[in-house]
Amino acid sequence: MKTVLFYFLILLSAFGLHAQTQNKIDAKDSLPTITLKEVQLIGIKATNDTPITFTNVSKEEISLRNLGQDIPILLNYLPGVVTTSDAGAGIGYTGIRVRGSDATRVNVTLNGIPYNDAESQGTFWVNLPDFASSVSQIQLQRGVGTSTNGSSAFGASLNVETLDLDLDAFSSIATSLGSFKTLKNTFQFSTGMLNDNFSFSGRLSQINSNGYIDRAASDLDSYFFQTAFQDDNTLIKALIFGGHEITYQSWYGIDKEVLENNRTYNPAGEMYDETGNLSGFYSNQVDDYTQKHYQFHWNEKINSEWNFSLGLNYTHGSGFYEEFNDISSGGDTSFSYLQLEPYTLGNIIIDDTENISQKWLDNDYYVMTIGLNHQTAVSTFNFGGLYSRYVGDHFGTLLWGQNIGNALPKHRFYENQGIKTEGSFFAKATHKISNKIIGFIDLQVRGVNYSIEGIVADPSKLSVDDQLIFFNPKAGLTFKPSEDQSIYFSYAKAQREPNRTDYENGAPKPEKLNDFELGWRIKKEKIQVQANLYWMEYQDQLVLTGAIDEVGAPIRQNVGESRRLGAEVDASIQLADQWLWKPNLAFSSNKNLDFYFKRDGILQNLGETQLAFSPNVVLGNALIFAPSTRFQIGILSKYVGKQYMGNIDAENSTLAAYFVSDLNAVFTWQPKRWVKEIQWSTIINNIFNLKYESNGYFFTYDDTWSLPGQVTTIEGAGYYPQAGIHFLTGLKLIF
């Protein structure tokens, strides 16, 4: 019934909007847009004159594969990128790594507003399902990149711009379906420019999928609305967007034995009978979270050389994950953990219980950004500033227990609050030193104040009060021997604070990074190439240990010195009128230097070891055949080399190399009547049906009880299997 109502509403809206539209427009997915930049991102975006390594992804490129998978999966074929999916098929919880750096080190901004969670520093795209349908461009900067808003980039930064204003009215309906009972419905509309000054547009989306992993279902809803006023010198825009996700938990992974015999098995929600035998699974072992974003942007052209921008943001997030804790499976069942008093029943002391609990997050995030930009024929100057405040409440509630004594309903067994404030500003400039040489300088100061106070889920008291100030300078030169090519060199320093999990696990130090980039770009009519070398030197890097916490988040630790060296090549070559070839290569060496590890109770110097989750080879390729402007088909391939999930080079910690190919076909036509354009898209993922794992975890512990007086280090690993051959196909109607 829900789906039927959805279709009725969007069809009614589509015909109503079409009836009001009198202007004949070009029937393309990329409708005409105004030239005035809608959200001022000049200060944080890179251009061809910036000595930074970057790749731009357009709305048109995104739309070819946008059938319901998350943004990280849509960026999978970019240089040096590795993506992950807990549910195995790109819907639900997904992740991205760039140059071996995980998502907590990839700075993400939405219209210049930081999107990384202030405490965990992660990005959770599951909270914004189908956000790709509201994106006009994504810029991926590899390395430190330019100064940006939010925490410093330690591997990459991702600048996401939402949709431009449309000159003409339109509406569209898009439906896609595929393997694992995946179904996506999207309705979009725009009024176009009303009286040449006002515009209103929006999107509604639903995504449902059972996932590849058992019970790893996703039930996702999202919305995006924007209204704008613009004239020759002013653009004011207000945006409201957000999402609600309910996903059955699939972040536990499976061990090697289960992987070989039942790779889709999901241990989440296991329930056991009195004899210790598996009796079933808890049906509501879900993650349930809502995130709402409110943005206001004002961009003012002062004169032909100066412009000013102001951005305001409020984000509210609230939700929980619910779990059944079974005594037989070693769950969180003890009274000490649940903050309950033991009691006596007859002659038996009751001090543990099967239970159902919810662990909550309830947070508010306020941001203000300002920008002042000056541009002439020979120089540019950008000043940017940010102030943000985050308040996050963390608490756990007990919903049910078999033997909980006098505990009150929804008894809270932990409760704490994290508060993080940040103030930063940057000043950057480019100047044409000569006709062929452009200088670049970028200076940033960040101040961070982070506090945590209360009881965490150990239970134990956690008290953190940390104030940090960072100075991050950057500089470089671009040499342009001709109009179609450039050579650049840059140096960038980045420093940043630990995240919440780091503080919970000890007394972490801030990280420091010196990044050197040397690159060459050439852009001709039928060939574009970008090649670069990088040298990233870390001090006190918070490396992934390979272990994870109870919600699958990675655990990190400071190491002394570490290094990433690499070479990357990214090309687009028009082989013939109908053939386009887009290869990319990334070769790297990723090392801990002078690494120590305690094995069997003895501290050992392992010397140089591989950094966790850092493959030395990542290759991407796209070969596209377009016999006409209406049809194209392409094969996309990805090779990811062997990875270690820990930092001690243990063979038990490896993820095998894998080579995966997808087939993507798109057909468009214009009926030229009441439907302006129809677009059909299909993607067949993993066409060779490879069994592979793109993510996992590794842990060690010391066995001190099996042999008295002897310590034995035990290793363990878990894996996240990815789906074999599976497909998505969709139809989009533009009115």
Regions found by a protein language model. Give the residues of each.
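Membrane-embedded beta-barrel scaffold of Gram-negative outer-membrane proteins
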Residues: 301, 307-313, 480, 486-492, ...
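A beta-strand signature from Gram-negative outer-membrane beta-barrel systems
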Residues: 129-172
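Transmembrane beta-barrel wall of Gram-negative outer-membrane proteins
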Residues: 170, 177-208, 213-250, 296-304, ...
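Gram-negative outer-membrane beta-barrel transporters
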Residues: 435, 535-537, 557-647
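C-terminal beta-signal and adjacent terminal beta-strands/loops
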Residues: 581, 589-591, 642-644, 668-735
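Short, acidic, small-residue-rich periplasmic hinge/interaction motif at the N-terminus
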Residues: 21-64, 103, 528, 532
